[in-house]
C-alpha cells in the first residue's frame, strides 16, 4: 500500500551546517505573504482509529501515518520525481542496488530528542521482524531475499537491495520510516516482538506518543474525535519558501462520524473544512449549497479517477468444507464475477459518477490497463451455465440452487457498516444472485471488526467468514500493480498481511505462484514498456482466476470551504495527490483564513 508522504524538493545547496528543508512555492496556490498562522483544520473519519502503533497499524487512513513526517526521500507532485527530504543528499550505486544517505542535521522528534541514523536502524530491526506482524513486513524482502540496512557512521545510512528494484525509490520515501530509538529499542530489548505489539494502543497517554511530523496527538476520545496539536520542533527543520516555520496551523480536529450521510450534513452545516462527495446526489447537494451561498467554498467535480478499489473476496484458506471448497473453485469465482452488475453499481451506488472495474490496477492508471479485462463482465446466463457445471442444476422449493448432495448455494457477504457505497454494492450483488438461485445473506459490521476477521492468526477460527467487500487505496506509481503484502502467499507475518483470500501461509493455487513470480519480475524491470507488458500479464492472470472480484470505481470530487487555504494548484489536484483526511493539499502548507 502507498504510504508516500507528499514532500517537496529542497531549495538551496546543502552545507555542513544544519539546513532546514524548504517547501517550494509551487506546492501551494497561495503566496507566503498571504498566509495567516494559527487555527484548527477540521476533518472527519468514518470509524475509530485502531492504534497509535506504527508497527501494527494496517487501516487506512491511520494516525501513525498522519503523525509521521515522511522518510529519507519525498515525492514531489508537481514534477512526479523523488528527492531528498529527511536525507540531505544521497548516492546510488551503478548497479542500482545500494543507496547511501547523509541524514539531515537538526531534525527532532516531538519530545525534542534528535532524529538520527539510529532511528532508521530501529525501524529496520523491528519492522523486518516477522513476529512483529507489521503491515509492511513483506516490503523488506525482494523475492524472499532481504534488504539490508547498516549504519556507516553517526550521519550516514546505507541501504542495500538484494536486486535492482525499480520501486526502491518509493520504499525509501514511504515505507522505510524512522522510529524513535529511545522509545522502542528499550522495549524491544526487554520484551521482544510482543512488547512492541503491546505498545501505543489507542488508549495510550498522548504525552507518551513521540512523532516526527508537523502534528502530535493532544487527545483521543473514542467514538468522538482525535485532536492533534502542532509539533513545536517540526518548524525548526521545515520552512516555507519565505523561511517561515511550518506548519501554519495550530492543530487538527478529526471527528469520528460513522455515517457517510452525516458527514455530508456536517460539511453543509459548516463544521468540516473539506469533503469529497462520493455520488451524484451528494455532489448535487454540495453544488446547490455553494451556488446558493449557504456554503462559501470551492467544488471541483470529476477531478480524476480515484486511486482506490472495491472488490469482493472469498475465504479460500482451505477446501475443508463445502463452502471453502466451492470458493476455491475458479469456475465458481468466474460465475460470481458474471453476476456482478457493475453498471447498476455505478448507477445506483455512485449516481453514475464512476466506472466498472475488472482489474486491481486503479482506473487512474489507465495506460497500465490492457484491453479485454472485462471477459467476465455481467452475464447471468453464462454464470448460471458455469454453476450448472459445478452441479447446481436444480432449485429447491425456496428458489435456491442445490447440488445432488443437498448443499444449498448460499453464503454470507460482509461489508463495513460505515460505508454506504459498499452496502449498496452488496445489495446489487444480492439481488442479481437471487435471480439465478444464489442466496446471499448480507451483513454490515464495524470496519475494525471486519479487518480483524481478515487478519491471519495461527488459529484460523478468527477468519470465520465466507466473503467480504472491502477495498485498497494507495500503492506506487512506478509499478502500480499491488504490493508484496497483497501478492505474497507464504512467509506471512502475524496479522496485517493483505493476501486476503488465502491466509494459510502457503501458495494453494498455481496462479498465486505465477502472480508472485510476475510481480518480482516487473519490479526488476527498468524499461517502462517491458514493465507495462509484465503488468498486463499479471492482470490477465487475475482476470482468469478472480481472486479479487473487482466491482466499480468512483470518480473523485473535491470540495472545501473558503475558510481553509493552501490547496495544490489545479494541475496537481487529483486522486494521487490527495489524502482521505485532508484532500488535495499538503497539511504543513494548509492555513485558516480568518
From Swiss-Prot:
**Keywords assigned by UniProt, alphabetized:** Signal, Transport
Q: Which residues form the signal peptide?
A: 1-18
Pfam families assigned to the protein according to its UniProt record, in alphabetical order: SBP_bac_5
GO BP annotations listed: peptide transport
Q: Which CDD domains match?
A: PBP2_NikA_DppA_OppA_like_4 (cd08500)
Q: Which SUPFAM superfamilies match?
A: Periplasmic binding protein-like II (SSF53850)
Q: Name one GO cellular component term.
A: periplasmic space
- Residues passing through the membrane, by range: none
Entry keyword annotation includes Cell inner membrane: no
Gene Ontology MF: a single term: peptide transmembrane transporter activity
Q: Which family does it belong to?
A: Belongs to the bacterial solute-binding protein 5 family.
Q: What does the UniProt record say this protein does?
A: Probably part of a binding-protein-dependent transport system.
Question: What's this protein's name?
Answer: Probable ABC transporter-binding protein DR_1571
Q: What is the lineage of its organism?
A: Bacteria, Thermotogati, Deinococcota, Deinococci, Deinococcales
Amino acid at each position: 500500500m502507498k504510504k508516500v508522504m507528499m514532500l517537496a524538493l529542497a531549495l538551496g545547496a546543502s552545507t555542513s551546517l544544519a539546513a532546514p528543508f524548504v517547501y517550494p512555492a509551487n506546492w501551494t496556490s497561495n503566496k507566503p505573504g498571504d498566509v495567516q498562522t494559527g487555527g484548527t483544520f477540521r476533518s472527519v473519519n468514518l470509524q475509530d482509529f485502531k492504534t497509535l502503533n506504527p508497527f501494527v497499524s494496517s487501516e487506512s487512513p491511520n494516525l501513525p501515518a498522519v503523525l509521521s513526517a515522511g522518510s529519507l526521500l519525498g515525492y514531489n507532485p508537481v514534477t512526479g520525481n523523488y528527492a531528498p527530504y529527511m536525507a540531505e543528499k544521497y548516492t546510488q550505486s551503478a548497479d542500482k542496488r545500494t543507496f547511501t544517505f547523509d541524514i539531515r542535521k537538526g531534525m527532532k522528534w516531538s519530545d525534542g530528542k534528535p532524529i538520527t541514523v539510529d532511528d532508521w536502524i530501529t525501524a529496520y530491526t523491528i519492522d523486518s521482524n516477522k513476529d512483529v506482524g507489521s503491515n509492511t513486513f513483506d516490503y523488506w524482502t525482494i523475492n524472499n531475499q532481504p534488504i539490508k540496512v547498516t549504519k556507516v557512521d553517526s550521519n550516514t545510512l546505507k541501504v542495500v537491495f538484494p536486486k535492482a528494484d525499480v520501486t526502491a525509490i518509493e520504499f525509501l520515501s514511504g515505507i522505510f520510516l524512522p522510529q524513535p530509538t529511545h522509545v522502542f529499542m528499550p522495549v524491544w530489548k526487554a520484551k521482544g516482538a510482543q512488547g512492541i505489539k503491546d505498545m501505543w494502543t489507542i488508549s495510550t497517554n498522548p504525552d507518551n506518543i513521540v512523532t516526527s511530523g508537523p502534528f502530535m496527538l493532544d487527545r483521543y476520545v473514542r467514538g468522538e474525535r482525535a485532536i492533534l496539536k502542532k509539533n513545536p520542533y517540526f518548524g525548526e527543520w521545515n520552512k516555507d519558501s519565505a523561511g517561515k516555520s511550518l506548519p501554519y496551523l495550530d492543530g487538527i480536529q478529526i471527528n469520528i462520524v460513522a455515517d457517510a450521510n452525516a458527514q455530508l450534513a456536517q460539511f453543509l452545516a459548516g463544521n468540516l473544512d473539506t469533503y469529497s462527495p462520493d455520488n451524484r446526489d451528494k455532489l448535487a447537494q454540495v453544488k446547490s449549497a455553494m451556488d446558493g451561498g449557504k456554503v462559501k467554498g470551492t467544488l471541483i467535480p470529476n477531478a480524476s479517477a480515484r486511486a482506490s478499489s472495491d472488490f469482493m473476496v472469498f475465504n479460500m484458506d482451505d477446501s475443508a468444507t463445502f463452502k471453502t471448497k466451492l470458493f476455491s473453485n475458479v469456475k465458481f469465482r468466474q460465475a460470481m464475477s458474471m453476476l456482478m452488475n457493475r453498471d447498476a453499481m455505478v448507477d445506483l451506488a455512485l449516481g453514475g459518477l464512476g466506472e466498472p472495474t475488472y482489474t486491481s490496477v486503479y482506473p487512474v492508471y489507465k495506460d497500465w490497463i490492457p484491453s479485454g479485462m472485462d471477459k467476465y463482465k455481467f452475464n447471468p446466463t453464462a454464470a448460471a451455465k458455469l454453476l450448472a457445471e459445478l452441479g447446481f442444476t436444480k432449485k429447491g422449493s425456496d428458489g435456491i440452487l442445490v447440488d445432488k448432495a443437498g448443499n444449498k448455494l448460499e453464503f454470507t457477504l460482509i461489508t463495513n457498516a460505515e460505508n454506504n457505497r459498499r452496502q449498496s454494492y452488496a445489495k446489487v450483488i444480492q439481488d442479481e444472485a437471487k435471480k439465478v438461485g444464489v442466496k446471499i445473506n448480507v451483513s454490515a459490521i464495524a470496519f475494525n471488526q471486519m479487518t480483524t476477521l481478515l487478519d491471519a492468526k495461527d488459529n484460523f477460527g478468527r477468519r470465520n467468514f465466507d466473503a467480504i467487500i472491502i477495498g485498497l487505496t494507495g500503492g506506487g506509481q512506478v509499478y502500480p500493480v499491488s504490493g508484496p503484502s497483497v501478492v505474497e502467499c507464504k512467509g506471512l507475518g502475524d496479522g496485517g498481511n493483505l493476501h486476503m483470500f488465502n491466509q494459510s501461509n502457503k501458495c494453494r493455487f498455481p496462479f498465486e505462484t505465477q502472480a508472485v513470480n510476475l510481480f518480482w519480475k516487473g519490479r526488476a524491470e527498468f524499461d517502462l514498456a517491458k514493465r507495462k507488458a509484465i503488468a498486463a500479464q499479471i492482470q490477465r492472470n487475475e482476470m482468469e482466476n478472480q481472486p479479487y472480484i473487482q466491482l466499480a470505481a468512483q470518480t473523485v470530487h473535491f470540495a472545501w470551504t473558503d475558510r481553509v487555504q493552501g490547496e495544490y494548484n489545479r494541475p496537481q489536484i487529483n486522486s494521487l495527490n490527495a489524502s482521505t483526511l485532508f484532500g488535495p493539499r499538503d497539511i504543513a502548507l494548509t492555513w485558516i483564513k480568518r
